[in-house]
């Protein structure tokens, strides 16, 4: 749930909404005799609590403050829509176990239709036979442990290539006295992960030191960036359907244009793969596997090209954003906590040494690094508010009646920093996952820690995402000394967009830890 409104949009919207006050219908209210969750005071006519959520704080912080006042479950109004916000693990467990089927569908949002092939993508498809078939195919053909292992050479080669290029950049730009060079890691992590996912999905490698200005590469990245931005953008029509005709901010038009652009790009890849199949080329990326499996078939009446394009776009979007965001936060936290960095280097030197490059098989031995990634996801989950779901029937949560049609928002950030569960919850302490909290996992079985969501619609790419982050972070820290260029801690200001990203660039100092022969032999 992203709330992106510029000042002009808000101004025009509020004036129009007030003029249309008489149209307001108090739909979805709690019926007499049925006690709903506590309702946050101060809702505006028609626009509800939107002004609260558009304040200076990020929405998950604002909702966290409201939980301190109203309790672990409360209701708000987003335009004409009722929503309940749950903020502790007990309530989350009720939602994702007892009531999971009832909340397994998502609201029918404008972006899901205009960007996601009319809700054909698994991340927005309604819960039902079509969604179940998509998930089964995705899990068996791309995200199963055996398939993830089969593609390990792609991950390793992309990380190694990127490390080599970073070493060459260091050699060209290093300071003679200190031996350090300045790098901006947001871009480096982004291009590395983008290359990795594209190779696994469609066999493309768009970025290297020599091709970063390639027209096709830039076209693809621009379109994906726009998709990510628009998919999480708040539109007035979603909150107040009878005002959709106005298209405040022009977002719907942007969505149509971006959807068309991505459809053309992925369509070109699909045509290339069909040509390769005709020529007898044996390619084992996701697109080729899907063509072999689905060519000439339909899924619940859906055209095969739409299904394949939906799969590809889902994996690119979900596989890049969360991993990049986690890598940025992890590196920032490590630099702001020097003792953690020293422990990581010691573990890497003991388990891997400095005479060879890191392998995926080393990762299972890097227990402190695993704890660092886990603690990063606790403090900075990629989506601190869960993707909104919608109750398809009346339910009871925490003893309160929640009516059909109400939206569910889980404040993962608040759950992850609950002082009733975690000691010193706002501190970065990876050691907690090696001692008191070592048995808590991140895969939906322990509701105290849900960085990938919970229930039937938990993120299916957990294993691939964790493997990508661990390998990239371990390889980077193993290969380079890193240093904060300032005596002040790195700025940790958050920006709430598609993922909860770092507001400022991540500029740091690096120099090699290994001998030059190690980098050149990669």
Swiss-Prot record:
A cellular component annotation (GO) from this entry: membrane
Superkingdom: Eukaryota
Annotated heme binding sites: 459
Keyword Ribosomal protein in record: no
Gene3D superfamilies: Cytochrome P450
TM helices/strands, residue ranges: none
Cofactor requirements of the protein: heme
Localization: Membrane
Family: Belongs to the cytochrome P450 family.
Protein name, as recorded: Cytochrome P450 82A2
Native species: Glycine max (Soybean)
Protein's gene: CYP82A2
């Amino acid at each position: 749930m992203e709330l992106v409104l510029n000042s002009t949009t808000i101004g025009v919207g509020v004036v129009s909404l007030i003029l249309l006050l008489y149209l307001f219908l108090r739909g979805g209210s709690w019926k007499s005799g049925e006690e709903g969750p506590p309702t946050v005071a101060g809702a505006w006519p028609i626009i509800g609590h939107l002004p609260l959520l558009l304040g200076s704080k990020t929405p998950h912080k604002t909702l966290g403050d409201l939980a301190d006042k109203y309790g672990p479950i409360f209701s708000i109004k987003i335009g004409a829509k009722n929503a309940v916000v749950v903020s502790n693990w007990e309530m989350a467990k009720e939602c994702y176990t007892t009531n999971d089927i009832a909340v397994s569908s998502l609201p029918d949002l404008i972006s899901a239709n205009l960007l996601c092939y009319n809700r054909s993508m698994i991340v927005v498809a309604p819960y039902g036979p079509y969604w179940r078939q998509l998930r089964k195919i995705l899990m068996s053909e791309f995200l199963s442990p055996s398939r993830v292992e089969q593609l390990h050479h792609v991950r390793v080669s992309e990380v190694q290539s990127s490390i080599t290029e970073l070493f060459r950049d260091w050699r060209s730009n290093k300071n003679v006295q200190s031996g350090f060079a300045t790098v901006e890691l947001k871009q480096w992590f982004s291009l590395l992960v983008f290359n990795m996912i594209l190779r696994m999905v469609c066999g493309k490698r768009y970025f290297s030191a020599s091709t970063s200005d390639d027209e096709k590469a830039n076209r693809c990245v621009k379109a994906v960036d726009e998709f990510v931005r628009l998919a999480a953008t708040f539109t007035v029509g979603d909150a107040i359907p009878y005002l959709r005709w106005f298209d405040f901010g022009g977002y719907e038009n942007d969505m149509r244009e971006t959807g068309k652009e991505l459809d053309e790009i992925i369509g070109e890849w699909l045509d290339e793969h069909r040509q390769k199949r005709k020529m007898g080329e044996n390619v084992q990326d996701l697109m080729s596997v899907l063509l072999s499996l689905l060519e000439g078939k339909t899924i619940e009446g859906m055209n095969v090209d739409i299904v394949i394009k939906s799969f590809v776009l889902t994996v690119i979007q979900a596989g890049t954003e969360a991993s990049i965001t986690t890598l940025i936060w992890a590196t920032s936290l490590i630099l702001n906590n020097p003792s953690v960095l020293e422990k990581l280097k010691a573990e890497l030197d003991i388990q891997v040494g400095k005479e060879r490059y890191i392998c995926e098989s080393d990762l299972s031995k890097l227990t402190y690094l695993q704890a660092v990634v886990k603690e990063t996801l606790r403090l900075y989950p990629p989506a601190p508010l869960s993707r909104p779901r919608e109750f398809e029937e009346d339910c009871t949560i925490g003893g309160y009646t929640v009516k059909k049609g109400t939206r569910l928002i889980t404040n993962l950030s608040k759950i992850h920093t609950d002082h009733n569960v975690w000691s010193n919850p706002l501190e970065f302490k990876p050691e907690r996952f090696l001692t008191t909290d070592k048995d808590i996992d991140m895969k939906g079985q322990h509701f105290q820690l849900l960085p990938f969501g919970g229930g039937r619609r938990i993120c299916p790419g957990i294993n691939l995402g964790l493997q990508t982050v661990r390998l990239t972070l371990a390889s980077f820290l193993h290969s380079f000394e890193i240093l904060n260029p300032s005596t002040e801690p790195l700025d940790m200001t958050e920006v709430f967009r598609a993922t909860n990203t770092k507001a400022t660039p991540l500029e740091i100092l690096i120099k090699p830890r290994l001998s030059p022969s190690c980098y050149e032999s990669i």
